[in-house]
Amino acid sequence: MPLTCVAHWLAVEGVQPSIPQNPTASNQADLLPKGPNANPHLAAANGLDNYSVKPLVKHVLSKESQELFAKLSSALLDENNQEWQNAALTSIQSDPGIHQLTTYLITFIAEKVTHSMKNIPVLRAMLLATDRLLANPTIYLDPYIPYMVPPVLTCCLGKHLGPTSHQAPSNASSETLNGNNVNGHGRTNTEHFEIRKTAASLLQQICRKYSASNQGLKTRIARSCLKAFLDYNKPLGTHYGALETLRRVLGADGIRIGILPNLKIYDEVLKEALADDSRKEEARRILATILVCLDDMERSRGAVRANGVANLEGQRDRLADKVGSEVADQIIKSDRTAVAQAILEADLSMA
């Protein structure tokens, strides 16, 4: 009897179709680890009851895939073994077999971000894992983008990232152990700024690659960031993350329309923070970010650019009337004549 070959789908976008050629869920359920040491993420992702973690799509993992996921998730959280963590990140970026684990990795990242807001190393690891997942050329991520954005946006706009002044991780720096906080209450630990900046860069990358296939993606991100920036009850760290994201995602047009018209009102927030020793450093970071935003806006003018304002000191009142006295003083101090001209020529009533 001659041998023949028949083609069938093992998986479609990471989901195993229910056809006779593929094993059924009931046949594969016995492969899942059981007992108190079983991985809850795998159990939830495969449809077992009594677990709160819900996958994006339920399908069966082979025993090898289960073991791979367990090793990856363990390595990502092991901040004491950098070599192992780097190996996991390399696997996520380059291994074609990761596609089968995409749903579980995204769920894992989202859950860890949600429950580890006070743990900077975990947040950093989750952002790195997201970055490597985006860089894997063998994975079709378009359907997953709406689920990947929220944890990254949380790292960008989160109210408090890192330990509080009354709490420090076992491997915390001496600065944190001496009572420094990460979000502007007490002396400042700046690690959370790097987390927010990395998250903003990831959102920029996501928008560049996937905004065409995910309608309204850029608009939703920008709306969330603008709302956070205009909420003056939010901490300065949130304002910083919002500014970084708006600058990277919307570019010069977003700065001109969303940020520039609100700087005069924001001047009061800056004045109050600069007068507070515990928040002064954070306020200076935000001022520096605002200047970068204005530089980007000015550079985008292209051929419209001129020599700038000749007498900056003489234009201080006009500048302050548009962007507030703190930003105006920084523009004059840094001799940003072209930026001053771009601001003075901007029609804020049309923004």
Model regions and ranges:
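Intrinsically disordered, low-complexity terminal regions
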Residues: 1-96, 104, 152, 170-183, ...
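Generic recognition of cysteine residues
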Residues: 5, 140, 155-156, 207, ...
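Alpha-helical solenoid scaffolds in large eukaryotic transport, assembly, and signaling factors
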Residues: 45-166, 211-213, 246-258, 264-271, ...
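Alpha-solenoid helical-repeat scaffold
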Residues: 54, 61, 65-75, 81-87, ...
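Extended HEAT/HEAT-like alpha-solenoid repeat tracts in very large eukaryotic scaffold/adaptor proteins
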Residues: 85, 122-132, 148, 173-206, ...
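Acidic, Ser/Thr- and Gly/Pro-rich intrinsically disordered linkers and low-complexity segments
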Residues: 113-123, 131, 156-195, 233, ...
